[in-house]
Curated annotation (Swiss-Prot):
The modification Phosphotyrosine is found at Y68. Residues 423-439 have a biased composition (Polar residues). It comes from Mus musculus (Mouse). This is RNA-binding protein FXR1. The modification Omega-N-methylarginine is found at R476, R482, R484. The lineage of its organism: Eukaryota, Metazoa, Chordata, Craniata, Vertebrata. The gene is Fxr1.
Amino acid sequence: MAELTVEVRGSNGAFYKGFIKDVHEDSLTVVFENNWQPERQVPFNEVRLPPPPDIKKEISEGDEVEVYSRANDQEPCGWWLAKVRMMKGEFYVIEYAACDATYNEIVTFERLRPVNQNKTVKKNTFFKCTVDVPEDLREACANENAHKDFKKAVGACRIFYHPETTQLMILSASEATVKRVNILSDMHLRSIRTKLMLMSRNEEATKHLECTKQLAAAFHEEFVVREDLMGLAIGTHGSNIQQARKVPGVTAIELDEDTGTFRIYGESAEAVKKARGFLEFVEDFIQVPRNLVGKVIGKNGKVIQEIVDKSGVVRVRIEGDNENKLPREDGMVPFVFVGTKESIGNVQVLLEYHIAYLKEVEQLRMERLQIDEQLRQIGMGFRPSSTRGPEREKGYATDESTVSSVQGSRSYSGRGRGRRGPNYTSGYGTNSELSNPSETESERKDELSDWSLAGEDDRETRHQRDSRRRPGGRGRSVSGGRGRGGPRGGKSSISSVLKDPDSNPYSLLDNTESDQTADTDASESHHSTNRRRRSRRRRTDEDAVLMDGLTESDTASVNENGLDDSEKKPQRRNRSRRRRFRGQAEDRQPVTVADYISRAESQSRQRNLPRETLAKNKKEMAKDVIEEHGPSEKAINGPTSASGDEIPKLPRTLGEEKTKTLKEDSTQEAAVLNGVS
């Protein structure tokens, strides 16, 4: 403001020093030195500019001068007009012209100056221009030191900010200043903004430096978080950082985003450690045995989801076999978990416990399997049966062994087609051969020989017992079994022939005849039911075949009772059973060599009997036939046609071809009907 110094004329004629604050149309706003008078507007005709500072002081006697003096102690000093009366050395005697009375005073040379030649100011003496200030720069523009360089560049007398008009005021005594202000105003405001930003950063840096100095003496921790986990560490909208800052005792948390480094400062180590637990996210993996991966995951991921929920981890990932990012052991699969260090520790505890539990359960299961295997091996060697015990020493073809084998096949096999139980054997022997390994071969031969040589009465009694039990069975065959085949005990007689060639092979036919006799002795209702259920296919060696029926039809077309077969009612077949038999051609039991031998021998024996022998035993044979066939009974071998006629001659079966071959190759001894040579 020194450049805009003016002299304001007072009421007593003296000029007092003042400073221009604003320029108006016809006046100036002036502020007096030392504020001895309040700020006020002064007209142009009472204001003048001070003289140049480099003016020469040449004063002589009689010159008019201006003396720097004051009228009283309350007023400041001002320039008064006077005249030099006398000079003596450095002292001058002056006479004030403003006063009415003559007033003389001795003053020194420093208080004198030549009369100011400047006239009062006019409207064009001072130039004023304004610059609008943005809102963000108003506070900065209020400081006059911010315009120091701008003031010097434009040549302004004064630059200040007017808060009422929010403008920057530029006052100058030169018109060129206005042009320069218009050119440099934008640049000046931009520079102020840049300076303001730099100043604010410097202030923040200063504050940070002070805080750092204070925190350096306190507790702090520093850790690094991976770049891909930085989002989890910060949290949604910085929630994790805010939660860490709310921990009591935490003073500051700093984050370097470039390096992913967190710095936590606090008043205590516990507070700093607790805040670190909210921000430190890591990734770790746990090796899981490959055979337990499915059980660790659980059905629909239920087990692994429960582990994740209880531990607090963020996510879990199972590394595939094609990925080799993590080191893995043989037979192990890495489970990768992401979360805080605390949650990773929790999931390790849960997973290790669960794996130990699964291993223990697997070990118990393996022990159970070993025990079951040992039991299975022991059971294959010896299987005790409740129905057998004291009767083990009886023959193979007894009633008890037959019933036992049928019951055993029921308990182990299903009811479907072609299913055979574990007691089924395709050889010549029976189940008793497998279940009684302790018996010697000689004992078997003795038992078979005894059975084949047993009396006719004893055999008939046994077969009658068998025939009484057979009709009650649920199966389709004559025997009481549930499947298609007959009793397995029938095969023991075949095997006896093969194992003991010295015995009489024709004794097998007696069993068949005794079977037929036993069937005749049974009730008529049971017999008709069983005959209706029979099929044309031979079930076992004990059943009569179609060829046997044809052989008998050659000898006598009318049965022993004198009734023709055509007079009988046509047999009614079950359609469902007939459809059932069509698809069971593949389920036939295998035909063995013993079957061919027994069948061929029986047929050849009947055909090659001498006429004398047949005539001799005709009475006995007729007696047996009468006992076997009742008046209401149908033909034994093979069903009749619907019209009651006999079955027409069928093509030769495989048994007949076998019989023909045996006749040509070997000679057959003559035998009587009852098998006694």
